[in-house]
């Protein structure tokens, strides 16, 4: 810099990119395929970026729908797309499954995968107590075994050309693109829902 301080060479984009493809899922059929004993499941996934001690989660991918047995359904996952690496620090991938509640559909965590150099690590034999099958991750969990609810359903990356950033006292950041004023999710500067514009 002008004062003799070194200029940073490494930098990261603000925000986490939305995955470009739906997850690749294969259903393992069992003997009970009667319609009354099957269910349709929707799966999607997000990227997780680490910034210091803070984890930032992307908006979800498109969903994939599969039909499987309620009692013993097994869905195998593989071929997760390679995450972008240049100027992003994506360290994880979270897989979610839709759960139908009394009045709404929520996506709940199935598992979290480690991402190294953009690729999901599936070389381990087990992950979080689940044994891989020929490099494929099996979901055999019952609904009550699922984890946290997806919170980033409506998150978006900061819009292209965002300028004039101002910290607000409520934890939000405001900025503008042309004549549009944008706001981030409170205390989450990587998430800029277009509904807040």
Walk through the language-model features, giving the residues of each.
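Disordered, low-complexity "stalk" and linker segments at domain junctions of extracellular
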Residues: 1-197
């Amino acid at each position: 810099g002008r004062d003799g301080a070194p200029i940073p060479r490494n930098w990261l984009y603000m925000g986490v990119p939305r995955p470009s493809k739906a997850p690749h899922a294969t259903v393992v059929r069992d003997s009970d395929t009667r319609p009354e004993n099957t269910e349709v499941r929707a799966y999607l996934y997000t990227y997780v970026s680490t910034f210091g001690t803070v984890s930032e989660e992307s908006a979800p991918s498109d969903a994939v729908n599969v039909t499987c047995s309620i009692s013993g359904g097994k869905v195998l996952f593989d071929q997760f797309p390679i995450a972008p690496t240049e100027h992003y620090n994506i360290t994880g991938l979270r897989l979610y499954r839709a759960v139908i509640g009394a009045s709404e559909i929520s996506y709940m965590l199935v598992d979290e995968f480690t991402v190294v150099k953009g690729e999901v690590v599936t070389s381990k034999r087990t992950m979080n107590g689940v044994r891989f099958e020929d490099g494929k991750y099996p979901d055999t969990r019952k609904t009550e075994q699922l984890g946290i609810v997806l919170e980033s359903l409506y998150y978006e990356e900061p819009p292209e050309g965002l300028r004039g950033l101002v910290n607000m006292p409520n934890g939000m950041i405001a900025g503008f693109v042309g004549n549009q004023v944008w706001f981030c999710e409170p205390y989450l500067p990587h998430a800029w829902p277009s509904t807040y514009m």
